[in-house]
């Protein structure tokens, strides 16, 4: 067999073009590929939801890669240990109720779970606006290549339709802030101080539909609510992603 460079190019272009066309209309779009977004997308995919994960950066994983201050370890509390088991993430007990896992393995296992569940990934893709029709509900996303945004080029975007949007953009709560900025009935209070116990204990209450068609998960949920941050303990991120998936699936009737 002789390799042909044009055939390689054609394979990439045709397959990715097919994936993009297929996801111009979908059930759910998860914006942000951190731990909460990955967990949410993986669990939605397992429920048979047609789902894509859109990430503005080259790689997914959010803040999980770096663990705490570049030490590639994360902590998960007892309440979320079952999700480490569910995704096949190895861990060690540290003290009672505290479990330590490798951050790189955690990202890899969550990503693999989402891939295995049929989630389509669109990295290097920035959501610059949302689409709202006459019913006042978010029904789609306005997207462009991240390098276009970084370079400040004047290039019109394209639109992808989705029934449910999940803001998993972390501390910035970017999608929620877009809605707020454009006059939607949504107020983003912004995250509060570091207080791990409070942040972790309240995150499930903040994981909800905050605007018609828009759900928030992970640190985006706490940021919208004005809640505290938690640092490198990730149980709340996983539990919030699970809860967001349940809410979206319920809304979709799955």
Curated annotation (Swiss-Prot):
It catalyses: hydrogen sulfide + glycine + NAD(+) = ADP-5-ethyl-4-methylthiazole-2-carboxylate + nicotinamide + 3 H2O + H(+). Involved in the biosynthesis of the thiazole moiety of thiamine. Catalyzes the conversion of NAD and glycine to adenosine diphosphate 5-(2-hydroxyethyl)-4-methylthiazole-2-carboxylate (ADT), an adenylated thiazole intermediate, using free sulfide as a source of sulfur. Transmembrane segments: none annotated. Belongs to the THI4 family. Its cofactor is Fe(2+). This is Thiamine thiazole synthase. GO terms for biological process: thiamine biosynthetic process; thiamine diphosphate biosynthetic process; thiazole biosynthetic process. Homooctamer; tetramer of dimers. It comes from Methanoculleus marisnigri (strain ATCC 35101 / DSM 1498 / JR1). Fe cation binds at residues 156, 171. Its EC number is 2.4.2.59. NAD(+) binds at residues 36, 55-56, 63, 127, 154-156, 219.
